[in-house]
Regions:
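A short beta-strand-turn-helix
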Residues: 63-80, 106
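Structural alpha/beta surface segment adjacent to cysteine/selenocysteine redox centers
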Residues: 78, 83-167, 227, 232
């Protein structure tokens, strides 16, 4: 596993995906005018409005059920659940993906393993928004096609790039753009992040087999853990 942070970095790990983005922003710009404008925009006679910055469409609040729904492959009734905490900006996640390790495991344990993806966008400042984009693609039933496109053309994670990937895999562009621009799935990404830190995950990819977090897992270690979970 790569992308593991040094002890010094881990001590200052951002508390959330939003904090990771904010850290980068604070280093580049003076936000005093933005704060004043936000305060003014939030004051409405007779009530409070939900603000979605810069004229972007407002996100629809997520249900608790949606927070717990993840992209997955394999039967929900499978005796083993294999969770990957990953990042669409992670070079090691990409290498695992392109080498077909996930698909090899699913083939080896045919019908006995359910693979689940969860977001842990820790690697780049653009990773949290890319994670939201993946969730928007999942809404249209094409998360894994979208993931394929991002990893094939790796490193392109601007908002325009994320929208271009949506077009490449045949998503409804207007629906995807509205979802991404509104921050519709920021809460879902935060939910996954919080779950990862609870384990505690500090690098990607990270793997969990039936609730057991495997530190610094290799493909062989994953296979052994799955076999043990199956009682072999």
């Amino acid at each position: 596993m790569s992308n593991k942070r040094s002890p010094k970095f881990q001590e200052s790990l951002p508390a959330s995906p939003a904090a990771a983005r904010s850290l980068q922003t604070r280093r580049r710009s003076n936000r005093s005018q933005w704060i004043l404008w936000l305060v003014a925009a939030a004051i409405v006679v007779g009530g409070v409005i939900i603000f979605s910055g810069s004229g972007q469409p407002a996100a629809v609040p997520l249900s608790a059920d949606r927070l717990s729904v993840d992209p997955s492959i394999g039967p929900a009734s499978a005796p083993v659940t294999l969770i990957e905490y990953g990042d669409l900006g992670c070079t090691t996640c990409r290498r695992w993906h392109l080498s077909g390790i996930r698909d090899q495991i699913l083939k080896q344990f045919d019908g006995q393993v359910r693979y689940v993806w969860r977001d842990f966008p820790i690697i780049t400042p653009q990773s949290p928004k890319a994670a939201e984009a993946g969730q928007c693609a999942f809404d249209q039933g094409k998360f894994f096609e979208y993931q394929d496109a991002v990893y094939r053309d790796f490193g392109k994670l601007s908002n325009d790039d994320l929208k271009n990937f949506a077009a490449q895999v045949g998503l409804d562009a207007a629906r995807f753009d509205q979802c991404l621009d509104s921050g519709q799935y920021a809460a879902k990404v935060q939910h996954d992040w919080d779950e990862a830190k609870r384990l505690p995950v500090q690098a990607t990819p990270a793997w969990v087999v039936n609730g057991q977090y495997l530190y610094n897992a290799s493909p062989d270690k994953l296979t052994v853990a799955i076999q043990q979970a199956l009682g072999r």
